[in-house]
Amino acid sequence: MNYHIISHEWLTIAKVQEIIEKNIKIKIGEQAEQAVIKCRNFLDTKMKDIGRPVYGVTTGFGSLCNITIPLEDLSQLQHNLVMSHACGTGDKVRPEIVKLMLLLKIQSLCYGHSGVQLETVKRLADMFNCNIIPVVYQQGSLGASGDLAPLAHMCLPIIGMGEVYYKGNIRNAADVWAEMGWEPIRLKSKEGLALLNGTQFMSAHAVWSIINARRISDWADVIGTMSLEAYDGRIEPFLPQVHRVRPHQGQIETAGRILDMMKDSQIAANAKSHVQDPYSFRCMPQVHGAAKDTLRYVSSVIETEINSATDNPTVFPDEDLIISAGNFHGEPIAIPMDMLAIAMSELSNISERRIYRLISGQRGLPSFLIAKSGINSGFMIPQYTAASIVSQSKGLCTPASVDSIPSSQSQEDHVSMGANAATKLVKVIENTERVLAIELFNAAQALEFRRPLKSSPYIEHVHDEYRKIVPFISDDTYMHPYIEKSVEFLRK
């Protein structure tokens, strides 16, 4: 059986994607095991002779940090923490994102700076491997002290509480534990805090978004090129000379891709009567490229985050230190997630403008891309749908990270609101995918009005594959199923 070994090697987003998509199981490697054991042993020894309070280990939490807890109550303190912080509400987080949360939490704990028992980490790994996925809710995290409420829901099953997805059903964790022959784990000092304090809710949403944004960004170029051909657009704005004098990486990449995809196109080679195209066509390298550059930057930030220890306090056995600090704060990823939402929203914004041009009865295309307009409305309303989605995404692009509401009697007086940035980002990604699917629906229709001229072999191949599931529309028909099939096509 193929396993991914949890270690201190750099974990890439591409590797995370492979683990999730191929359902690869994980094992805690020797390096990680020893780091976890060493840190736990150090903490146990420290508890016996330390003469001062240690936040979250021998004290209460948040503004209760000045209340010292007797040694005999430390386990109950951690148990209470997990229960009391499970205050999420709203829609459930999709299981594939919760599975990402599990993986990222395991990775973070295995650096050996959190003080958890090896048994605890292995239980999380067992849950991951057996596809026992905790039920987590979208609302409840401020994005500092980490993602407390959602991570509490994720970790409730460890102590035999909460609910899980198992074999297609939502079940009580205690019942599933009984079936598996697992006992609830008795948490030791600091463990509850190590489990709850972290950025894995935000990070998992960010990783999911990046994986899908990369795919959608690629499709934006393909679909935009098909629209350009259908609109009888000019090839000159994509020539390399233009982009050498403004050498943004994403811009150069986009122009190069579009040129490659238009190679040997009869439509592109045909003489044009118009001097230039609207911005939504000729500025694709600049707009799509800016989204690519943003995605590249955000990916680098998130990759650093998923290779980090993000709980508090941080334990350093080699230096004989337990330091209360702020690695749980989500600001380093909240701002980039807001940026990525804006970038992806712009892909849908420019896409909707191309849709509008295609249905406007210009350049030899019939109004609303239907031969017998009047009795037929044709592609009039898909543009309305795209416009409504784009408008929603624009509203969602108000940055979450500019907000902060103090909590815990103002001990936690600045928070990132990164969890809100994360959930908004997921919605914007989904919206962008749908708008691009609607553009494909329109572009494929419009391209056929260019016959007998053909586009490039590449674009014609994409068109042929798409036509296997969505037909040319000759007369008005029920459009919704074709929009949904278009979305499915982009996910293949």
Name these PLM-found stretches:
Residues 28, 32, 66, 70, ...:
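Short secondary-structure transition/capping motifs
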Residues 55-69, 73-77, 84-109, 137-159, ...:
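FAD-binding core of FAD-dependent oxidoreductases
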Residues 2-24, 28-35, 39-42, 47-50, ...:
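C-terminal auxiliary extensions adjacent to catalytic cores
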Residues 10-44, 48, 52-57, 61-99, ...:
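Residues that scaffold, gate, or flank divalent-cation-dependent active/transport sites
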Residues 92, 115-117, 218, 307:
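Alpha/propeptide regions of enzymes that mature by internal proteolysis
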Residues 113-139:
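FAD-binding glycine-rich core of flavoenzymes that anchor FAD
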Residues 136-141, 318-322:
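Cysteine-centered functional microenvironments
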